[in-house]
């Protein structure tokens, strides 16, 4: 099949085997872009037939990494997976049914079901969480965002939305949640600040409180039980961290700019 499955990794030996095993029935090429793993990630991936390449020193952020991996793909059609994601038999069958007739300008959106401590999260705004992951690289590619990257839709694009979800086992334990969320707020804040976004410090508590209300009440997180309450509280802290990072990154950029302006006088 003229398709490459792309997986980004960094010390993912706990996940990579199951991820690649779930993708093998597609019969696609598999490309793993690894960022200096010190565990068995790369050896496991190679043993399963994947081509493994390293992230170059100058490539930073998730968007640029995905774009670099795409540039090394042996096919125009690419499917992106994270190491903690799994393709189900039903999703494989659905993908196989659409691939033969997929147009070049089509972008495939796949619903994603995330598990938190073993509980599927179907509310909180986390489902169906459709991700644009399958596309022809001659038509589009991931944007350059450092985090929360996405695939833009050029004019004339056709979005094909699948029914069966990708399973996302991102947070089996409490420490996994905090570890994965740790770098995202900083990357998000730097990215937004570099694009000219700013926020007031006094607004941050209100943003965080509103995000809790939106997640737990408006998006019915209470229907996910204790996991929904835990996630809503954690998301409130995550939202505060994002905007604190934006506030600090904006101050640094503005101070540097003022210093440059004064130096020209």
Predicted regions located by residue number:
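Short, basic, low-complexity termini and linkers enriched in Ser/Thr/Gly/Pro
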Residues: 255-265
């Amino acid at each position: 099949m003229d398709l490459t499955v792309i997986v980004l990794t960094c010390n993912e030996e706990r996940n990579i085997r199951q991820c690649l095993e779930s993708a093998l029935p597609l019969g696609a090429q598999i490309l793993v872009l690894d960022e200096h793993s010190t565990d068995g990630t790369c050896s496991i991936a190679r043993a399963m037939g994947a081509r493994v390449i390293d992230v170059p020193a100058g490539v930073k952020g998730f968007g640029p990494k995905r774009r670099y991996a795409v540039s090394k793909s042996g096919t125009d059609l690419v499917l992106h997976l994270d190491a903690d994601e799994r393709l189900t038999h039903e999703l494989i069958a659905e993908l196989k049914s659409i691939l033969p007739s997929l147009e070049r300008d089509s972008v495939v959106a796949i619903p994603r079901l995330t598990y938190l401590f073993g509980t599927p999260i179907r509310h909180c705004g986390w489902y169906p969480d459709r991700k644009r992951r399958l596309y022809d690289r001659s038509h589009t590619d991931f944007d350059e965002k450092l985090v929360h990257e996405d695939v833009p839709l050029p004019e004339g694009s056709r979005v094909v939305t699948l029914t069966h979800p990708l399973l996302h086992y991102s947070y089996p334990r409490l420490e996994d949640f905090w570890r994965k969320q740790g770098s995202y707020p900083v990357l998000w804040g730097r990215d937004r600040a570099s694009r000219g976004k700013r926020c007031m410090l006094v607004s941050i508590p209100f943003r965080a409180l509103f995000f809790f209300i939106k997640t737990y009440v408006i998006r019915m997180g209470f229907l996910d039980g204790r996991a929904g309450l835990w996630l809503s509280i954690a998301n409130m802290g995550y939202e505060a961290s994002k905007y604190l990072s934006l506030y600090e990154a904006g101050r640094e950029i503005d101070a540097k700019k003022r210093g440059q302006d004064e130096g020209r006088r």
